Amino acid sequence: MAPSRTSTVKNKNASKHAANGSGIRNSKTVSRAQSDGVSKSKGKKATQSKGAPPKQQKQGSKLATLKKKRRVYTEKELGIPALNMITPVGVEKPKGKKKGKVFVDDRESMMTILAMVNADKDGQIESKMMRARQMEEIREARKAEHERKQQLQKEKLSEMKQGLRKKRNRGGDDDGDNGRGEALAGTKPLKPKKKTVSFA
């Protein structure tokens, strides 16, 4: 008879693991396949067993309560100014009154304030005018002084000129004839002639 072939099994557990799709007994896939059911973490069990609720839920509840309690304020409460109002500079708005519309209760007091302001402005203008007048007077005084000095100098010069002329006239009359005679006699030398040089 011919010998019959028998199938030899090298690994006894290979048939079991073939269904799972792996041949290794201690592989990760096997452990995953076994624990594919409901997985529960140990940390969660420990916190839940203590009885303390998770922190994330607390924060969420706080935010929800804050959102519910948030109040909506009106424009009057916030103090937002109304548009299209012309207000003078430096006037502070009193609470509950229109800004820049009513300045003073009494008309007389308002007029006195206005008169004081106008007086200050006039005083400033007057002081400027006074300064200008004073400067003009100072300029005129300086000009007059300068003219006086020039006139004195002119008078001194004219006196000096007249004195020199008188001396010339007196000296010319006395020495005129004597000079001519001396020049002729030879005692007083005549003016020497200028030397001239001619080039050929």
Swiss-Prot record:
Coiled-coil ranges (or none): 130-170
Gene Ontology molecular functions: mRNA binding
Biological processes per GO annotation: intracellular mRNA localization; mRNA transport; ribosomal large subunit biogenesis
First-listed, main subcellular location of the protein, grouped into a coarse class: nucleus
Alphabetized InterPro entries for the sequence: Loc1 (IPR037650)
Bias type Polar residues, positions: 1-12, 23-38, 48-62
Biased composition (Basic residues): 190-200
Biased composition (Basic and acidic residues): 135-159, 170-180
Region (Disordered): 1-68, 135-200
CC per GO annotation: nucleolus; preribosome, large subunit precursor
Keywords: Coiled coil, mRNA transport, Nucleus, Ribosome biogenesis, Transport
Protein's cellular compartments: Nucleus, Nucleolus
Role of this protein: Required for efficient assembly and nuclear export of the 60S ribosomal subunit.
Quaternary structure (record): Component of the 66S pre-ribosomal particle.
Assigned protein family: Belongs to the LOC1 family.
Protein's name according to its UniProt entry: 60S ribosomal subunit assembly/export protein LOC1
Organism: Botryotinia fuckeliana (strain B05.10)
Taxon lineage: Eukaryota, Fungi, Dikarya, Ascomycota, Pezizomycotina
Primary gene name: LOC1
